[in-house]
């Protein structure tokens, strides 16, 4: 399935139905009074967050959504039926913005969450509504009110427990494939991953979701390599696993490059817990491993994990470290 994390759509709620002009007609009643019913309300436009989706690709093929017009009023004081609603089904984590793409309307963070984006127009009053002591037989009715029309932006920020970050070719996709059933594209060239991937990891009977985002480069927070959109997908994570490839000549510089982008982007990433790991260590001998591990520790201020998704070295330890931070974060959220 192709990935799409931002799109523009056009919505319009339904017009209200017109009120009816009608008079009571019955045998032996010569002057029946007005009995025109009111028109029905127009259909609303809703958005609903559902599980099972992790892309907005469906909105590439349909960008226009319109609620149905309310049914017109009828004689015998019958009110028209409400127009059918239309619902946009979006992945959990989708944000809805006004046309300026800056003003947030709603953040769809929970499965089943619904929000009315546009209310249908009210139905018009039938002529029975206008009967008075001075006008016993009004011969007019109101038209229904028009529905709301607006342009909105949908922006997806995936919801995962842990996010994988690092430079291109840091081994993020290989890590994800090794510990989950996700099958991201893996190859030995930069920017193999062009969109985020999700996988469910299990360790000691506990499950959590990991997001692999495309590799970050210098200037990502300013949109270089559309990195600012990639970074949005790890905003909601509880912990970051920062992978630094052992194949980097300067592991300290590789670490600080990504760390700078996270800090500069903001969005809470600067304060998010992180676990640093030296990845792809199967390519190093013992002396090289010791030297690069020491250099990385000096740069990040803590002892990095040593992992290789190819040989499975350190994978369980990395997953347990992620699980512990995630569990602590969830416990803190429940107490808050």
UniProtKB/Swiss-Prot annotation:
This protein's UniProt keywords: Cytoplasm, GTP-binding, Hydrolase, Magnesium, Metal-binding, Nucleotide-binding
Any one of the GO CC terms: cytoplasm
EC numbers, comma separated: 3.6.5.-
Residue ranges of domain Obg in the record: 1-159
Presence of the UniProt keyword Acyltransferase in the record: no
GO molecular function: GTP binding; GTPase activity; magnesium ion binding
HAMAP family: GTPase_Obg
Entry similarity comment: Belongs to the TRAFAC class OBG-HflX-like GTPase superfamily. OBG GTPase family.
Protein name: GTPase Obg
Lineage, opening ranks: Bacteria, Pseudomonadati, Pseudomonadota, Alphaproteobacteria, Hyphomicrobiales
Gene: obg
């Amino acid at each position: 399935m192709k990935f799409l994390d931002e799109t523009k759509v056009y919505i319009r709620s339904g017009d209200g139905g017109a009120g009816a002009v009608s008079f009571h007609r019955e045998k032996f009643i010569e002057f029946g009074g007005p009995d025109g019913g009111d028109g029905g309300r127009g259909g609303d436009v809703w958005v609903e967050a559902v599980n099972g989706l992790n892309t907005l690709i469906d909105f590439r093929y349909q960008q226009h959504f319109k609620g149905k017009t309310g049914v017109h009023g009828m004689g015998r004081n019958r009110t028209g039926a409400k127009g059918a609603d239309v619902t946009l089904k979006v992945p959990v984590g989708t944000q809805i913005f006004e046309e300026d793409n800056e003003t947030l309307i709603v953040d769809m963070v929970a499965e089943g969450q619904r929000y009315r984006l546009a209310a249908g127009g009210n139905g018009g009053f039938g002529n029975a509504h206008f009967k008075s002591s001075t006008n016993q037989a009004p011969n007019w009715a109101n038209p229904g009110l028009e529905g709301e029309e607006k342009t909105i932006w949908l922006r997806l920020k995936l919801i995962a427990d842990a996010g994988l970050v690092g430079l291109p070719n840091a081994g993020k996709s290989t890590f994800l494939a090794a510990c989950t059933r996700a099958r991201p594209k893996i190859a030995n060239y930069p920017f193999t991953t062009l969109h985020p991937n999700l996988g469910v990891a299990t360790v000691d009977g506990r499950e959590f979701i990991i997001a692999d985002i495309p590799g970050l480069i210098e200037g990502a927070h300013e949109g270089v390599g559309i990195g600012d959109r990639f970074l949005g997908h790890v905003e909601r994570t509880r912990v970051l696993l920062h992978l630094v490839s052992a194949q980097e000549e300067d592991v300290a510089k590789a670490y600080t490059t990504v760390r700078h982008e996270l800090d500069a982007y903001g969005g809470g990433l600067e304060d998010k817990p992180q676990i640093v790991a030296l990845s792809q260590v199967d390519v190093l001998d013992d002396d090289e491993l010791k030297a690069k591990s020491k250099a990385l520790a000096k740069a990040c201020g803590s002892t990095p994990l040593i992992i290789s998704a190819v040989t499975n070295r350190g994978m369980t330890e990395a997953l347990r470290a992620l699980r512990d931070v995630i569990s602590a974060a969830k416990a803190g959220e429940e107490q808050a």
